[in-house]
């Protein structure tokens, strides 16, 4: 037997043994660790950007308004790129190729940051790398659900490794930036992006199947206009808009309140630990409660979280409580949202459904980053986070009145 074949068989047997050891036997032949490894590195990149990108731009001397604009640019690209790549993925069926090319072009595009640190050049780098970065995840989500087939509720058991990658990154970089200058920040991002490229080469392909699923008739537009679907997508944008001040300025806000970068990294990690625990519980939650109830609870807790962060973040116990609420504002929201998208579109429209989710999340995130950038210095953190709270409450009202009560 050739050595390369024997090595592959060895790792396959190890993968199966580990999956069985942790009670995941029903997911075989799911390539659990290969999918999980990709999520780990993909969200490690988010863990490197969400807490520290604004801090890096502040280190370069940009104003709050400019920081808000630079952070919003990747989110604006999220409004454009996923729809193009989603249509291409559904049309060609070559989703894994799109994932691999997107990961490689993300790395190459971001590497241009080493040429200049001017505002115009950084804006170009943010737009270029984000155009390809946002091509990756929606297509990979379709591949993951294709591997899961009739067990979509187990998505969270794979996705939780993305949260692990986020946690490791924020802790490591938080400590690192206490000892070293933020000038090394772009190098750290390039290393993580290289990991995404390598993991994309390790993942096997899979295509969505309609077998065992209730037939969903009509094209993408007809499915999109089904009862409750437009309302759901509106709430996606509102939820991400409510996160705008958090993702853009919470690190700077906590620094101004006297927290060290190491502690800030741990606080970010705490939120994602809560998210991981929620992912582990989501299968049981979605089997017991309707998507409508889970989404409503997520939005209401998000509204409360932003009020706490905007008004009482100087109290550590309040800050700890607010970070634990990340379990709802991202964990339960994202898992239930993915379940909603997966059940609402047929196999031939899954890529477009995921792309629209990413697009509207980008619209909301960009709007949130922009208004936070312009209001932070003029209105202050309390008013800025209060506006975020209102957006989350609006999403709760829409879900309560427009989404039907049924089980995931």
Regions found by a protein language model. Name each.
Residues 64-65, 149-161, 261, 345-357:
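Loop-to-transmembrane helix entry/capping segments in MFS-fold secondary transporters
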Residues 22-29, 203-236:
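Juxtamembrane intracellular "pre-TM" segments in multi-pass secondary transporters
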Residues 97-111, 293-308:
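Structural signature of the two symmetry-related core transmembrane helices
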Residues 127-161:
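Cytoplasmic helix-loop-helix junction between adjacent transmembrane helices
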Residues 185-201, 383-401:
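Symmetry-related core transmembrane helices of the 12-TM Major Facilitator Superfamily/SLC fold
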Residues 57-58, 88-89, 160, 175-180, ...:
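Interfacial helix-cap and linker-helix signal at transmembrane-aqueous boundaries
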Residues 40, 109, 119-136, 237, ...:
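Hydrophobic core of transmembrane alpha-helices in multi-pass small-molecule transporters
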Residues 28-75, 229-267:
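Helix-loop boundary and gating motifs at the non-cytosolic
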């Amino acid at each position: 037997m050739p050595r390369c074949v024997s090595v592959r068989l060895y790792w396959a047997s190890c993968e199966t043994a580990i999956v069985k050891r942790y009670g995941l036997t029903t997911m075989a032949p799911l390539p659990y660790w290969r999918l999980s490894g990709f999520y780990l590195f993909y969200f490690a990149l988010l863990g490197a950007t969400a807490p520290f990108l604004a801090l890096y731009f502040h280190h370069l001397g940009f104003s709050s308004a400019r920081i808000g604009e630079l952070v919003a640019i990747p989110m604006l690209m999220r409004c454009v790129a996923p729809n193009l790549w989603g249509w291409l993925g559904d049309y060609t069926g070559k989703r894994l190729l799109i994932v691999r090319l997107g990961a490689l072009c993300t790395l190459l595009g971001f590497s241009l940051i080493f040429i200049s640190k001017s505002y115009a050049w950084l804006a170009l780098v943010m737009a270029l790398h984000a155009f390809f970065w946002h091509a990756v995840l929606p297509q990979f989500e379709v591949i993951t659900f294709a591997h899961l087939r009739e067990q979509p509720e187990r998505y969270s058991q794979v996705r939780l490794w993305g949260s692990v990658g986020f946690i490791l990154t924020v802790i490591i970089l938080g400590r690192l930036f206490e000892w070293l200058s933020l000038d090394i920040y772009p190098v750290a991002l390039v290393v993580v992006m290289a990991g995404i490229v390598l993991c994309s080469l390790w993942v096997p392909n899979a295509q969505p199947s309609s077998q065992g699923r209730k037939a969903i008739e009509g094209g993408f537009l007809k499915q999109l206009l089904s009862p409750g679907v437009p309302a759901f997508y509106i709430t996606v944008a509102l939820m991400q808009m409510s996160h705008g001040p958090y993702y853009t300025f919470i690190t700077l806000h906590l620094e101004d309140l006297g927290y060290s970068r190491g502690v800030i990294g741990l606080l970010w990690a705490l939120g994602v630990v809560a998210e991981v625990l929620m992912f582990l519980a989501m299968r049981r939650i979605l089997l017991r409660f309707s998507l409508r109830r889970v989404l409503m609870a997520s939005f209401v807790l998000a509204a409360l979280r932003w009020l706490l962060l905007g008004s009482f973040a100087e109290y550590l116990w309040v800050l700890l409580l607010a970070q634990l609420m990340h379990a709802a504002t991202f964990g339960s929201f994202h898992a239930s949202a993915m379940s909603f998208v997966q059940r609402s579109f047929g196999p031939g429209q899954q890529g477009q459904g995921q792309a629209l989710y990413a697009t509207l999340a980008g619209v909301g995130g960009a709007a949130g980053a922009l208004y936070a950038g312009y209001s932070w210095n003029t209105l202050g953190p309390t008013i800025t986070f209060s506006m975020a709270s209102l957006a989350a409450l609006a999403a709760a009202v829409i879900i309560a009145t427009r989404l039907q009560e049924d089980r995931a």
